[in-house]
Regions:
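C-terminal helical "tail/cap" subdomain of flavin- and related membrane-associated enzymes
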Residues: 323-410
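Residue-level detector of alpha-helix initiation sites
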Residues: 12-13, 37-38, 112
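N-terminal FAD cofactor-binding segment of flavoenzymes
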Residues: 41-84
């Protein structure tokens, strides 16, 4: 049996970020993952500006190595397609200047990101990184946990569970059952040779009437590839009996804005499905000697479906909470509340606003009316750009009176 201060379960973005942050303060850890790396991971492959921001905060040198090794494509905005085929190009940052502004976003295969982060951990952790290692059971003791794995037992004073949407960590309290409204289902595949991609690599979100409050996406990738997919809330999928793969194929074949662009494109492999645990304030993410991070903590953005940026942030915050625990020699429930409070302070407002936006998308007629009024409105692109940099502006967009004034050009 090996002993350590922190056992991190899961070597995805949340787990590896936690490991790298712990290492900066010389906190001993072991990190385990059931997979070998590099591994395929179902994802949209789009990374918001949160990703370079938090990696730079951890280490500017790591961000430089990421750009050098993974060669991510810089993405500068979003092309929204609303019901009625109204198209709006919205830059992440208006009048972007590379010398003044940070990288607004990336697209890169998740397989490459995860492998890079694991390599960074391997360089500092060596044999403390245990891949192809399955957690069999976890037993809570007075001074921590005994984790029984396929590679032997680990004794740890704390656990950070970053094992994803399929997390089986049994916390010592009853978890609420996952709600269909707090879960999204998604299908994605890869294509080569899709025509008409934006020259500044805008990602494309199609809010089509028959799939609201979900969307169809086209995300450009390096080497002439594109990540194509569709994501819809689980309760809507169940109620309407939606076959996601079939709907995705129907859009590619028949949508007038999409179909011509795929005429000479080649699909690479079969579609793959995944489950996205959306932000849920009822979900408890910390307690005596443990924390949940990333998808295990239900931190996927309810509007955009982004999970990687929030996973990295939560891994960073979990590590700093663990550092505080060892500095103060406190691991009790009351002390661990600080982790959830910091997560809510950093991510909670954004999650709440995204949830309310997603609720608005349930009403196709209203969305279509807004899109029609917004078409050609010179104020809309700038206003929507501000959504990505200013949460107060995003909150304003939930005010019907404010929306009406903008749409009426007042």
């Amino acid at each position: 049996m090996q002993s350590t201060s922190v056992c991190i379960i899961g070597a995805g973005p949340g787990g590896t970020m936690a490991a790298l942050r712990l290492a900066k303060d010389n906190i001993p850890f072991v990190i385990v993952d059931k997979d070998e790396f590099p591994r395929e991971k179902i994802c949209g492959d789009a990374l918001s500006g949160k990703v370079p921001h938090i990696i730079r905060r951890l280490s500017p040198e790591i961000l430089e190595r990421f750009e050098e090794k993974c060669k991510p494509m810089h993405s500068f905005g979003i092309r929204f397609i609303a019901p009625g085929n109204y198209v709006f190009d919205v830059p992440f940052i208006e009048n972007y200047n590379a010398e003044k502004h940070p990288v607004p976003g990336y697209t890169v295969k998740r397989k490459l990101l995860d492998a890079f982060m694991v390599e960074e951990v391997s360089n500092i952790a060596g044999e403390k990184l245990m891949t192809a290692c399955t957690v069999m059971s976890i037993e809570k003791g007075e001074d921590g946990f005994i984790i029984d794995t396929s590679s032997g037992q680990i004794q740890a004073k704390m656990i950070i569970d970053a094992s994803g949407a399929a997390s089986s960590f049994k916390a010592p309290y009853p978890k609420p059952e996952p709600e269909p409204k707090k879960t999204a289902l998604a299908v994605r595949t890869y294509y080569k040779g899709v025509k008409g991609l934006h020259p500044e690599n805008f990602i494309e979100l199609y809010f089509l009437e028959n799939i609201l409050p979900g969307y169809f996406w086209i995300f450009p990738l390096p080497d002439g590839l594109a990540n194509i997919g569709i994501g819809i809330r689980k309760d809507v999928v169940l109620k309407k009996k939606i076959n996601l793969s079939a709907v995705m194929d129907e859009i590619i074949r028949n949508n007038p804005l999409v179909s011509p662009r795929f005429r000479d494109a080649e699909r690479l492999g079969k579609p793959a499905a995944c489950r996205l645990p959306l932000g849920n304030p009822r979900f408890r993410i910390a307690g005596e000697r443990y924390m949940l991070a990333g998808d295990a903590a239900h931190l996927v953005d309810p509007l955009t479906g982004e999970g990687v940026g929030n996973a990295l942030y939560s891994g960073f915050i979990a590590a700093e909470q663990a550092i505080d625990c060892f500095n103060e020699n406190r691991f009790d429930d009351a002390f661990m509340l600080a982790y959830g409070q910091r997560i809510r302070r950093v991510l909670g407002k954004e999650m709440s606003i995204s949830t309310n936006f997603q609720k608005m998308l349930k009403y196709p007629r209203m969305v279509k009316w807004i899109a029609k009024r917004a078409d050609g409105n010179k104020h809309i692109p700038g206003l929507m750009s501000s959504m990505f940099t200013d949460l107060d502006h995003r909150k304003k967009l939930l005010n019907p009176i404010f929306i009406l004034r903008v749409l009426m050009n007042r």
